[in-house]
């Protein structure tokens, strides 16, 4: 199981870069330096919704309020699949340990 890191340009009116780290424990860490945002959220609290400029990544339960980040459809698709791969790796590891 590996930590995966990726950088996405947010598709907002004020573009910024979101540095995302997918932890093998099922957590997504997000840092947007331009907005002074940094948070960690469980994969179970991450949603993808169609937005006006692509897809919206919704991270629930972040300091009591959801955080929404606009991604291109391609970037959202890639992130979704990276999260699914991490989930599968974690499930395989847990089964092997049982």
Say what each PLM segment does:
Residues 1-98:
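Positively charged, low-complexity terminal tracts
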């Amino acid at each position: 199981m590996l930590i995966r890191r990726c950088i996405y340009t947010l598709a907002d009116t004020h573009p910024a870069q979101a540095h995302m780290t997918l932890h093998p424990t099922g957590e997504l860490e997000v840092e947007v330096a331009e907005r002074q945002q940094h948070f960690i959220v469980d994969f179970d609290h991450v949603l993808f919704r169609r937005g006006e400029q692509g897809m919206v990544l919704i991270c629930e339960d972040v300091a009591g309020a959801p955080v929404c980040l606009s991604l291109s459809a391609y970037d959202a698709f890639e992130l979704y699949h990276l999260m699914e791969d991490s989930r599968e790796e974690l499930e395989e590891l847990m089964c092997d340990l049982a």
